[in-house]
Amino acid sequence: MLQGDWSSDVCSSDLEEIIMKMWKKAASVMLASAMVVSLAACGSSGNSGKSDSGSSDADTFKIGGIGPTTGDAAIYGTAVKNGIQLAVDEINAAGGINGKQIEYKFEDDQADSEKSVNAYNTLKDWGMQALIGTTTSTPCTAVVEETHSDNMFQLTPSATAVDSIQYDNAFRMCFSDPNQGSASADYIAENKLATKVAIIYNSSDTYSSGIYQTFATEAKAKGLDVVAAEAFTADNKTDFSVQIQKAKDAGAELVFLPIYYQEASLILAQANKAGFTPKWFGCDGMDGILDLDGFDASLAEDLMFLTPFTANATDEATQKFVADYKEAFGDTPIQFAADAYDCVYVIKAAAEKEDVTPDKSVSDICDALKKGMTEITYDGLTGKSITWSEDGEPTKEPTVVVVKSGEYQVLQAEDAAE
């Protein structure tokens, strides 16, 4: 019966019955196999609300970074990327964190919130266990929603907006917008730089408007006369003739610029053409103005701004960092590079304080680093005896630099009012 014509031995109805039984048996086997696979998958899934990366055989820490390496803000993201790389290389050469090496990966977000979230997801898929980033405030505010949901530790080197570290898993290395605004007003008043002050700010930018608000409040409290407060937006940031003229007509002795250096360079050039020569004072977004292509650096002479770092500082740590950075990347580091460099060493200090190892889950690493951050005191490039509160804010002293002969120099209090 195994050979020959089935029709000669089996009637049509019997043949159909045999075929149906065979199909049912095959289907049962396939269904059972599928259930085994499904149950195995369910057994291996973790808590969807928390990131569960990390395994018992993990032997390296995976640290990710996010910032703009292309686009208008590329100077900031590139500096952050390089600063992290320099610190990672040093730490790995010295034995790593708790004896474990660091793997490092950086993603470009073009200072865009949606791209920043995509970059975060890319790094998470890579296996990131802690994030240094993001570099700018608005993307950071978007990404912190993701890191909070995943209980991923996040330390931003340079995002200053209050909401960019609004959850307990997030910390910052830099000053916040409110801190920069109040510290700037205090410095101007206490060093008698001016009594009549104008402000030109970007009302469409979180960083700029945040600093403006606290500066205006603190300036009034310190007895400064804010004679003009002129806004511009992202859609109108090339012609500042109206804002400059209003500040000039109001008799401003000093103009406060809580903005980024790109717009500041245009304001300085246009004010010079208008014959308006007040004192100029900015914040950390001003760092990089001397490196802007096509900008006449002489227009920034005597420009002052608040920053935690200057490459011309004479202490040994800064001089070594600057020399190593120049050798590695061919540029002089700006504050963003120093902030990022410090971030890696801060994570190392917190991890060693809590004996963190890379075989732990992302969530466990985050919880340990959160605890460690509030217990360490850190001496770095961007401040001495830095401590952190549970809400992620650092406590450190600001530095004011001034542009002299095309270089940044630390401004001493006795020289400020000259």
Give a label for each model feature:
Residues 37-41:
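C-terminal motif of bacterial Sec signal peptides marking the signal peptidase cleavage site
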Residues 13-29:
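Bacterial Sec-dependent N-terminal signal peptides
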Residues 21-25, 43-418:
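Extracytosolic ligand-binding ectodomains
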